Amino acid sequence: MRRQAGATLPGMRRALLIVGKAPVPGQTKTRLVPPLSPEEAADLYRGFLLDCVSLGLDLGWERVSVVHPAWSGQLLAELLPPRVTLVEQSGHGLGDALSSAFEGHLADGFDRVVLIGSDNPTLSRRPIREACDALNDHDLSIGPTVDGGWYLIGMRAAHLGVFENIEWSTPRVYAQTMAGALGLGLRVHAVHEWYDVDEPPDLERLRGDLLSLPSGVAPNTRVALDRLSMTAVSH
């Protein structure tokens, strides 16, 4: 398994974790099928993942890791830049995988660990940096999504209880995570709400957002969307 740490800098060491998988048809963005074909959905997700990884590398933090299912490892090693650390998910279910990833990075000596998904290609660096800075005087940072989940979570110590008793992939994820954090007595900072591109209406919102954003935002996603438009015209 490839494991490439970022450069060690004086002072605080920060790690960004990205939950992702290889862009394989039938395994990624299945809720966009239809209207997309499995191949189109996988190609679009490839753009999402590459843009999220580029965003992470642009932060200049000491490590960017992609937390992935076992079957994705070799494919991601071929797709992603060598500066990216690949971390195979462990345990049973998403909660165990997130707990293990946070615990491992904190044990490696990182002072701040922030995790994002790979479903929001227009996300900017601002909420990630805000989440990291907030950990100076909070125990947990979190970014809610419009559908009741969260797209970001960060911590400076292993408060792994926040990943317990969560009904993952439901509209209750954010509320249950917050309830767990408050039950543990954690000080929580919430960054602004954002959205994941999971359903066809989200895809339309993404298209609209990209029209108003600078052309340098989400370049890989733009290329994938252009391919979709060309396919639609040809049919």
Residue ranges, per PLM feature:
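A short, N-terminal amphipathic alpha-helix
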Residues: 43-61
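Conserved alpha/beta core of the MobA/IspD/sugar-nucleotide pyrophosphorylase nucleotidyltransferase superfamily
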Residues: 176-235
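Catalytic metal- and UDP-sugar-binding loop of GT-A-like glycosyltransferases, i.e.
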Residues: 116
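N-terminal nucleotide-binding beta1-loop-alpha1 segment
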Residues: 2-3, 7-31
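Short, glycine-/small-residue-rich phosphate/pyrophosphate-handling segment
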Residues: 159-180
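Conserved donor-nucleotide/metal-binding helix-loop-beta segment in metal-dependent transferases, i.e.
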Residues: 123-147
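Acidic donor-binding segment of Leloir-type glycosyltransferases
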Residues: 62-85
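Short phosphate-binding loop-to-helix
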Residues: 78-113
